[in-house]
UniProtKB/Swiss-Prot annotation:
Keywords: Phosphoprotein. Residues 112-121, 214-225 have a biased composition (Basic and acidic residues). Residues 98-107 have a biased composition (Acidic residues). It comes from Bos taurus. It comes from the Eukaryota. PROSITE patterns: LYSM. Residues 97-153, 170-225 are annotated as: Disordered. The modification Phosphoserine is found at S23, S33, S99, S164, S179, S192, S210. Disulfide bonds: none annotated. Residues 40-84 form the LysM domain. This is LysM and putative peptidoglycan-binding domain-containing protein 1.
Amino acid sequence: MASPSRQAPLGGSGLLHGSRARSYGSLVQSACSPVRERRLEHQLAPGDTLAGLALKYGVTMEQIKRANRLYTNDSIFLKKTLHIPILTEPRDLFNGLDSEEEKDGEEAVQPSKDEVRPHSAERKKRERGLGHANGEPLPTAGQEPARHDLSASDFLKKLDSQISLSKKAAAQKLKKGESGIPGEDSSLHLSSPRMQQRAVLGPVPLTQTSRTRTLRDQEDEIFKL
């Protein structure tokens, strides 16, 4: 009996049969998968180049060529628009599952209202106690403390008024000092008998000693030099 003809297995190595990669549709995890790509439409300008567009959108030149079926860099000017493939985040592929998990995590982290209320009540009691101790009236529950939000012009006007007030106060102090200091000095000087004698006799000439003469001679020599 003749042996049955053997059929070559599919995907065998040979000239006519290339090796096939087995995949399972949506389970393929590839960075260049069309499911994870979204394409932006870019209007071409006269100065646009493939390298510039790749840098601008954060993709490679080969990806732009593959998406637009370009074979050379100069063939981009044959089209008015180019499709730029941009990878989407894997979070978009889960149809909102991650967002629900994030919400659950945030609810677990945030404290409940029952836990927050006793802390706020304790703070209010402390603030009331401090206010009564300082003698300052505290605002009621319905009233909020007034906020003084000054504009730039109001702040400058307030600063100018404070400067003018300080200048007036300084001038008044100087006037009081000029009027009060001479009287005080005269009363102090005339209180002692020695000062009274000096006031009557006038300035007393200094006695010239040998020490004073030598000092004056030295000063004269210094000025001559």
